[in-house]
Design a protein with these regions (language model features):
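Short helix-loop-beta connector
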Residues: 32-37
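Anion (oxyanion) recognition and catalysis
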Residues: 146-150
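Active-site rim beta-loop-alpha module in soluble metabolic enzymes
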Residues: 159
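Phosphate- and divalent-cation-binding pockets in alpha/beta enzyme and binding domains
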Residues: 50-51
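Glycine-rich beta-strand-to-loop/alpha-helix junction loops that act as flexible
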Residues: 42-47
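Ligand-binding beta-strand-loop-alpha-helix segment within the catalytic cores
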Residues: 2-4, 15-27, 57-140
Length: 159
């Protein structure tokens, strides 16, 4: 770095980082286009709760982040500190919120113009890549997601 350049460091809490990711995705043209003209599927997860809150506000759709998760590992000290999970992913098709639906209900209808947001729960720092550790013995939500993403070229983003 030359003497005329400067750098700044910022400390973000986990919550602040999630809101930053959420605001960026809620402003992304491809994400908004999928929600308004095609199908946007946001899989339940703690980061995606912030993403959906920002998207729902932008799209004037109802949403409560409380319980927007499937598996939540809090450790023994906080085991009872979370709310019961919701029963549906956040799915918007052509601007309309599909209530009480999950990725399992819509995966077969997804195509190239559609978009899935599935939170990452693992990082490989050396390669700077995100990943998903699958806890279900039958593949969980990743199975229908992979069928859509690999088989029908549905776009997949790991916020």
């Amino acid at each position: 770095m030359s003497t005329s350049e400067s750098s700044r460091q910022f400390l973000l809490t986990v919550s602040m980082g999630k809101r930053l990711i959420a605001d960026a995705l809620a402003a992304d043209e491809a994400v908004l286009r999928a929600a308004k003209e095609h199908c946007l599927v946001v899989i339940m997860g703690s980061t995606n709760a912030a993403v959906v809150a920002a998207l729902a506000e932008k799209l004037s759709l109802p949403f409560s982040p409380k319980g927007f998760h499937r598996g939540l590992q809090l450790g023994p000290a906080r085991a009872g500190a979370h709310s019961d999970p919701q029963n549906a992913d956040f799915i918007v098709r052509a601007g309309e919120l599909l209530t009480d639906k999950t990725i399992f209900d819509v995966a077969d209808s997804l195509g190239q113009e559609d978009l899935i947001l599935k939170g990452a729960n693992a990082l490989h720092l050396k390669s700077q890549s995100a990943g998903v550790l699958i806890g279900s013995p039958v593949g969980g939500t990743m199975m229908p997601i992979l069928q859509a993403a690999v088989g029908r070229r549905t776009r997949l983003i790991h916020p």
